[in-house]
């Protein structure tokens, strides 16, 4: 299987998001990379489903809450930027203050 670096990155984010979801189901608080992966995966999958950029920017801020991440993590993440493929092309989506 020959994957481009971009495809490998997408796969890694998707796998990290799966791990994060399982940890949340068990009641384990997420660390920095897990929180970023979960939000990023939400945006990428939303784009794939055809959701609008503005919708994903707003909805991405409600994927996880402060009580689902380790202490201090919410304060470390100010913006999450994800390059996602939409039906009309690739766009950069920025989620501001994603953990509220």
Curated annotation (Swiss-Prot):
EC number: 3.5.1.5
Top-level taxon in the UniProt lineage: Bacteria
Subcellular location: Cytoplasm
Molecular function GO terms recorded: nickel cation binding; urease activity
Primary localization class, coarse: cytoplasm
Class in the EC hierarchy, top level: hydrolase
GO biological process: urea catabolic process
Catalytic reactions on record: urea + 2 H2O + H(+) = hydrogencarbonate + 2 NH4(+)
Pathway(s) per entry: Nitrogen metabolism; urea degradation; CO(2) and NH(3) from urea (urease route): step 1/1
Record-linked Gene3D superfamilies: Urease, gamma-like subunit (3.30.280.10)
UniProt-listed Pfam families: Urease_gamma
Keywords in alphabetical order: Cytoplasm, Hydrolase
A GO cellular component annotation in the UniProt record: cytoplasm
Subunit structure: Heterotrimer of UreA (gamma), UreB (beta) and UreC (alpha) subunits. Three heterotrimers associate to form the active enzyme.
Family as reported in the entry's similarity comment: Belongs to the urease gamma subunit family.
UniProt-recorded name of the protein: Urease subunit gamma
The gene coding this protein: ureA
């Amino acid at each position: 299987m020959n994957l481009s670096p971009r495809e490998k990155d997408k796969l890694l984010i998707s796998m990290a998001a799966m791990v994060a979801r399982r940890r949340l189901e068990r009641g384990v608080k997420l660390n920095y990379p897990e929180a970023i992966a979960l939000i990023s995966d939400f945006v990428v999958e939303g784009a794939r489903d055809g959701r609008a950029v503005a919708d994903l920017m707003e909805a991405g801020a409600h994927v996880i809450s402060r009580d689902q991440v380790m202490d201090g993590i919410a304060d470390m993440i100010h913006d999450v930027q994800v390059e996602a493929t939409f039906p009309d092309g690739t766009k950069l989506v920025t989620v501001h203050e994603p953990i509220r």
